[in-house]
């Protein structure tokens, strides 16, 4: 987390699963007041369409001007994903916000299937001289 314009993040995590209070990818839906996985594709772990949430009610992140959150995913942070996020916060003054995208721009993207997963793995291996773990 980069708080108020930091060049080096003051909060660093260990990856997606840990951020959402689990490990080794959720295999089944789970919900609690502060975090959960209401939708998971059990056969493919995080791949496919997975919905997760985490509320910072008991551990808020305080900021004054800006907040940038990044998250690590995949071995050595090398996995490409299409992620959508939402953030809620409290502020003392109201300000105008940008217009939301129209309905066509907000429609769901197609699910990733096993063929797509295979294609992504093969493309990644090619960038690593066909060594599954890189050089």
Identify the residue ranges that each predicted region occupies.
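Beta-strand-centric surfaces of beta-sandwich/beta-rich domains
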Residues: 1-134
